[in-house]
C-alpha cells in the first residue's frame, strides 16, 4: 500500500510517495524534523492495539525491575552499590559517543583521571596520613561545584520558562539547552562523586582502624584524635579555627570539620565513624543555609536510579518488543 506524506515547507506542499526518497540534508533542521515526524506517523498508523501491548509490557517490566532491584539492594547491598556505580560511570559515555557530545566526554575523562588517582591513593596500604584529607577535600570540592552548577542550570531553565531570556536577546531554545546542560552536569557528577566518596570513605576508615562496617572498632580512640583521618585535633570545639573548626557530635566524639562533613554529607554517612550512633545533622549544622544540601543529596539518590538503571530497563523492553515483533 502506497503511503503519501504531505508536509508544508516554505508555503509549498512536498509530497513523498512510499518508494521515493527525499534528500533531507538540504532542508533546515525544523523542516527536517517535520518530515521525519510525518514519516513516523505514517509508519505507525493503525497500530493502536500494538502500541497498547507495548505500554503494558513497559509498565510490567518497570514494576518487576523495581521489585528485583529493591530485593537485590536489601540482600546484597555491596554488590548492588558496586554495579550501580559502574553503570553510573559507563552508561552515559555510550550515549555521549553516539550523539557526539565531545564536551561532556572531555569533562568525563578529566573527572575519571582525577577520581581514579584519588581512589588509588585511598586504597593503598599503609594509608598515608595526608590521604584522608586529600580525598575528602576533593569530593567536597566536587560536591560544591556540582551543587552550584545544578542551581545555575535550574535558574536558567526557570528564567527561560518565564521569558526572562528575551531581556538579554537570547533565543529560548539556546537558553533552555544551556540550562538543561548545566542541570545535567550538576546532577550527574553530584551522584557519581557521592558514590565514589562513599567507596573511599569506607575503605579509608576501615584501613585506619577506628571504623568497621560490621564489627567493633579495632583501635582505641583518643579524645584528641580524629576518628576519620587519624590525625591530632589542635582546635577546641568552642574555639574558632583559622583553616577549619572542630565539631562535636551528639555522642560527644570530636572530629575535624572537613573530615566529618565529608563523612556525613559527601559519603552519605549518617552515623558516628567510631560508635555508629545516629548523627543529628540539624544540631551539627548551625547555619540555616547549610541544611538544604542535605536534601539535595537525597534528590541525587533518586536520580541514581534514572541514570544507572532506567537505560537498562528501556533496553530490556525494546528487546522484548523486538522478540514479539512489536514496533
Swiss-Prot record:
Reactions catalysed: S-ubiquitinyl-[E2 ubiquitin-conjugating enzyme]-L-cysteine + [acceptor protein]-L-lysine = [E2 ubiquitin-conjugating enzyme]-L-cysteine + N(6)-ubiquitinyl-[acceptor protein]-L-lysine
- What broad class describes the main subcellular location of this protein? endoplasmic reticulum
GO cellular component: a single term: endoplasmic reticulum membrane
- EC number per UniProt: 2.3.2.27
Q: Which GO terms describe its biological process?
A: ERAD pathway; protein ubiquitination
Entry keywords, A to Z? Endoplasmic reticulum, Membrane, Metal-binding, Transferase, Transmembrane, Transmembrane helix, Zinc, Zinc-finger
What parts of the sequence cross the membrane?
50-70, 79-96, 99-119, 148-168, 173-193
Q: Where in the cell is it found?
A: Endoplasmic reticulum membrane
Membrane topology category: Multi-pass membrane protein
Zn finger limits (RING-type):
226-276
The UniProt entry, under InterPro entries, shows: RNF121/RNF175, Znf_RING, Znf_RING/FYVE/PHD
Domain of life of the source: Eukaryota
GO MF annotations, alphabetized: ubiquitin protein ligase activity; zinc ion binding
Q: Quote the pathway field.
A: Protein modification; protein ubiquitination
Record-stated family? Belongs to the RNF121 family.
Function of the molecule: E3 ubiquitin ligase which accepts ubiquitin and transfers it to substrates thereby promoting their degradation by the endoplasmic reticulum-associated degradation (ERAD) pathway which is a pathway involved in ubiquitin-dependent degradation of misfolded endoplasmic reticulum proteins. May regulate the unfolded protein response to reduce endoplasmic reticulum stress.
Protein name as it appears in the record: E3 ubiquitin ligase Rnf121
Q: Which organism is it from?
A: Xenopus laevis (African clawed frog)
* Taxonomy of the source species: Eukaryota, Metazoa, Chordata, Craniata, Vertebrata
> Gene of origin?
rnf121
Amino acid at each position: 500500500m502506497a503511503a503519501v506524506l504531505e508536509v508544508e515547507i516554505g508555503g509549498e506542499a512536498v509530497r513523498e510517495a512510499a518508494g521515493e526518497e527525499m534528500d533531507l540534508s538540504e532542508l533546515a533542521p525544523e523542516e527536517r524534523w517535520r518530515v521525519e515526524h510525518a514519516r513516523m506517523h505514517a509508519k505507525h498508523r493503525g497500530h493502536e492495539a500494538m502500541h497498547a501491548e507495548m505500554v503494558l509490557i513497559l509498565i510490567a517490566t518497570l514494576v518487576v525491575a523495581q521489585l528485583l532491584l529493591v530485593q537485590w539492594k536489601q540482600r546484597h547491598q555491596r554488590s548492588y552499590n558496586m554495579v550501580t556505580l559502574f553503570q553510573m560511570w559507563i552508561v552515559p559515555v555510550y550515549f555521549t559517543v553516539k550523539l557526539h557530545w565531545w564536551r561532556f566526554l572531555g569533562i568525563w575523562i578529566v573527572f575519571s583521571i582525577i577520581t581514579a588517582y584519588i581512589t588509588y591513593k585511598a586504597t593503598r596500604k599503609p594509608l598515608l596520613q595526608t590521604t584522608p584529607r586529600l580525598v575528602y577535600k576533593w569530593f567536597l570540592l566536587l560536591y560544591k561545584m556540582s551543587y552550584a552548577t545544578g542551581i545555575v542550570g535550574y535558574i536558567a531553565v526557570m528564567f527561560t520558562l518565564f521569558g526572562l531570556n528575551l531581556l538579554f536577546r537570547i533565543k529560548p531554545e539556546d537558553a533552555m539547552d544551556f540550562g538543561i546542560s548545566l542541570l545535567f552536569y550538576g546532577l550527574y557528577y553530584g551522584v557519581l562523586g557521592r558514590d565514589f566518596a562513599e567507596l573511599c570513605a569506607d575503605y579509608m576508615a576501615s584501613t585506619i582502624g577506628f571504623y568497621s562496617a560490621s564489627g567493633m572498632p579495632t583501635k582505641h580512640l583518643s579524645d584528641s584524635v580524629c576518628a576519620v583521618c587519624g590525625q591530632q585535633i589542635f582546635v577546641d570545639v568552642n574555639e574558632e579555627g583559622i583553616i577549619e573548626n572542630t565539631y562535636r557530635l551528639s555522642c560527644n566524639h570530636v572530629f575535624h570539620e572537613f573530615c566529618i562533613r565529608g563523612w556525613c554529607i559527601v559519603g552519605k554517612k549518617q552515623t558516628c565513624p567510631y560508635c555508629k550512633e545516629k548523627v543529628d545533622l540539624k544540631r551539627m549544622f548551625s547555619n540555616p543555609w547549610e541544611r538544604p544540601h542535605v536534601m539535595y543529596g537525597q534528590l541525587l539518590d533518586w536520580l541514581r536510579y534514572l541514570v544507572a538503571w532506567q537505560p537498562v530497563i528501556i533496553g530490556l523492553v525494546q528487546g522484548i518488543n523486538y522478540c514479539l515483533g512489536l514496533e
